[in-house]
Swiss-Prot record:
This is Co-chaperone protein p23-1. CDD domains: p23_hB-ind1_like (cd06465). Residues 2-91 form the CS domain. Disulfide bonds: none annotated. Keywords: Chaperone. Residues 112-178 are annotated as: Disordered. It comes from Brassica napus (Rape). Acts as a co-chaperone for HSP90. Residues 157-178 have a biased composition (Basic and acidic residues).
Length: 178
């Protein structure tokens, strides 16, 4: 039997932000269907415990415009709504929502505040959404290598390691002081 990871969500009139909190997720699989069917599964931990989420989203979504990104602590989904409007809840079933489903207050912006430019905490860190299309595949790919100008592709972890070893960061300051 599988377990359910904590799932947080927030929205704008045209997007739904879904964060699955699952550290060290492996074998990540995602299926998103146009009618709003959302399925996630992954394993985590030394015993490779299976975690799954199966949701019927409130309304239709644009699978081709939706994206996903995997980090070491969570899996983030940027789901494009088929119709630009605010949803009064995330899922179709009325009544009590699953205990693992929570509002992401760090990303939440009220409907009235959206026009004022309020974006909440929308810093996605080093998430790389390029090439991650949730509609064409059931699996999320490996970490994409970054170009740092030296012609050699590096993962984000390798780039961070270089900065810690004394290279200058974006502001021209040494990241590590002796």
């Amino acid at each position: 039997m599988s377990r359910h990871p904590t799932v947080k969500w927030a929205q704008r009139s045209d997007w739904v932000y879904i964060t699955v909190e699952l550290p060290d997720a492996e074998d990540v699989k995602l299926k998103l269907e146009p009618e709003g069917k959302f399925f996630f599964s992954a394993t985590s931990g030394a015993s490779k415990t299976l975690y799954e989420v199966d949701l019927d989203l409130l309304d239709s979504v644009d699978v081709n415009e939706s994206k996903a990104s995997v980090s070491s602590r969570s899996v983030f989904y940027l789901v494009k709504k088929a119709e630009s409007k605010w949803w009064n809840r995330l899922t179709k079933p009325e009544g009590k929502h699953p205990l693992y489903l929570k509002v992401d207050w760090d990303k939440w912006v009220d409907e009235d505040d959206e026009d004022k430019g309020g974006e909440g905490d929308m810093d996605f860190g080093d998430f790389d959404f390029n090439g991650l299309n949730m509609g064409d595949t059931d699996e999320i790919g490996e970490e994409v290598a970054e170009e740092d100008g030296d012609g050699e592709g590096e993962t984000a972890a390798e780039t961070k390691e270089k900065k810690i070893d004394g290279e200058k960061d974006e502001e021209g300051v040494n990241a590590k002081k002796d």
